């Protein structure tokens, strides 16, 4: 896979997101401008300008009508994708570490940082939409506020499950927690990692999710039972991971801490995207093209490409080639052959 390099950020990347159709990529970084790109050729479509601090997170709704960003300037902003204008801005008590539209598009989740004697929280804002999915109203107050639970470290990342039924959060002490998506009631807390949870990304149907951690492990977890389905062990701290559609793979990225990068070579730093088989839990390949840690990895909903954002300030866009789709273990080839035999017998 030969990558397309997207150059539009002056500082490190913080998040990369595809829209539902997979034709646009939204990126945010530690500079104060977010970017929108064509996923086919990497051409920049436009920028979202209006923040006064680092943009820690970005998301786009299911209809690609609106994008949302969370920033270190104590604000959450909603943008009109068609022209890059600001539709609304909510002020927050502390910097915003993660934002995400609910699957239904009527709520926005934001993770607030634990600074200035504030313990941190997950807050939910609600919006009103018409029949054409246009937002007609923004509620100024909070729809829900989930404070840091007693006995837990602050939340770093959070995401919605299917239909917005649950909010799943990852904590600084390695725990994960599950909350009622409407009331904010804490439903379950689980000790999962030995170090902070760096990312949570759901499957396409949002029934299970992948956690990554700086303890070099990633876990596949069922959202209903909260049971660990699979565990992936790597040789470096992880910053992000995603679940691929079409193929039964997960992609993991990370590397040595950015502050230690100058003391080692790129090869020793493990600045790679690692491909693991989702079911067999074994590594099947690596892509090494960043000059620093991989901060975020996202795969297109169609499963035909993935994008990675790095500490080096670049986004690498990879379109999967034929060998990716053709790859199968012997047991998978045998199963496919048996299916053909069974079909022929009928």
UniProtKB/Swiss-Prot annotation:
Alphabetized UniProt keyword annotations: Cytoplasm, Initiation factor, Protein biosynthesis, Repeat, WD repeat
Subcellular location: Cytoplasm
Recorded GO MF terms: RNA binding; translation initiation factor activity
WD repeat windows: 8-47, 50-89, 150-189, 192-233, 289-328
Primary localization: cytoplasm
Gene3D superfamilies named in the record: YVTN repeat-like/Quinoprotein amine dehydrogenase (2.130.10.10)
GO BP annotation list: cytoplasmic translational initiation; formation of cytoplasmic translation initiation complex
Domain of life: Eukaryota
GO CC annotations on file: eukaryotic 43S preinitiation complex; eukaryotic 48S preinitiation complex; eukaryotic translation initiation factor 3 complex, eIF3e; eukaryotic translation initiation factor 3 complex, eIF3m; nuclear periphery
InterPro entries, per database record: eIF3i, WD40/YVTN_repeat-like_dom_sf, WD40_repeat_dom_sf, WD40_rpt
HAMAP family cross-referenced by the UniProt entry: eIF3i
Function: Component of the eukaryotic translation initiation factor 3 (eIF-3) complex, which is involved in protein synthesis of a specialized repertoire of mRNAs and, together with other initiation factors, stimulates binding of mRNA and methionyl-tRNAi to the 40S ribosome. The eIF-3 complex specifically targets and initiates translation of a subset of mRNAs involved in cell proliferation.
Assigned protein family: Belongs to the eIF-3 subunit I family.
Subunit organization: Component of the eukaryotic translation initiation factor 3 (eIF-3) complex.
Identification of the protein by name: Eukaryotic translation initiation factor 3 subunit I
């Amino acid at each position: 896979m030969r990558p397309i390099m997207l150059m539009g950020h002056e500082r490190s990347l913080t998040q990369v997101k595809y829209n539902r159709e997979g034709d646009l990529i939204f990126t945010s970084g530690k500079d104060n401008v977010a970017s929108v790109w064509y996923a086919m050729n990497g051409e920049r479509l436009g920028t979202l300008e209006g923040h006064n601090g680092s943009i820690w997170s970005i998301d786009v709704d299911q209809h690609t009508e609106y994008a949302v960003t969370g920033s270190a300037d104590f604000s959450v902003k909603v943008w009109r994708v068609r022209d890059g204008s600001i539709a609304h801005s909510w002020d927050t008590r502390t910097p915003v570490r993660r934002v995400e539209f609910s699957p239904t598009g009527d709520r926005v989740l934001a993770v607030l940082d634990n600074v200035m004697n504030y313990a941190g929280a997950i807050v939910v804002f609600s919006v009103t939409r018409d029949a054409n999915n246009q937002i007609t109203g923004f509620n100024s107050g909070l729809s829900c506020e989930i404070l840091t639970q007693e006995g837990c470290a602050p939340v770093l990342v959070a995401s919605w499950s299917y239909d917005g039924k649950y909010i799943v959060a990852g904590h600084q002490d390695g725990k994960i927690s599950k909350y009622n998506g409407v009331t904010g009631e804490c439903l379950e807390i689980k000790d999962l990692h030995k170090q902070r949870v760096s990312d949570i990304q759901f499957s396409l149907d949002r029934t299970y999710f992948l956690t990554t951690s700086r303890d070099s492990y990633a876990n596949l977890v069922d959202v209903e039972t909260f049971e660990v389905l699979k565990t992936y062990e790597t040789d470096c701290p992880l910053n992000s991971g995603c679940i691929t559609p079409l193929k039964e793979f997960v992609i993991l990225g990370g590397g040595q801490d950015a502050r230690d990068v100058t003391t080692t070579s790129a090869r020793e730093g493990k600045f790679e995207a690692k491909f693991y088989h989702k079911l067999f839990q074994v590594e099947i390949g690596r892509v090494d093209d960043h000059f620093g840690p991989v901060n975020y990895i996202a795969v297109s909903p169609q499963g035909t490409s993935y994008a990675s954002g790095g500490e080096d300030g670049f986004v690498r866009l990879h379109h999967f080639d034929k060998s990716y789709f053709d790859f199968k273990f012997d047991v998978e080839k045998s199963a496919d052959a048996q299916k053909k035999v069974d079909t022929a017998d009928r």
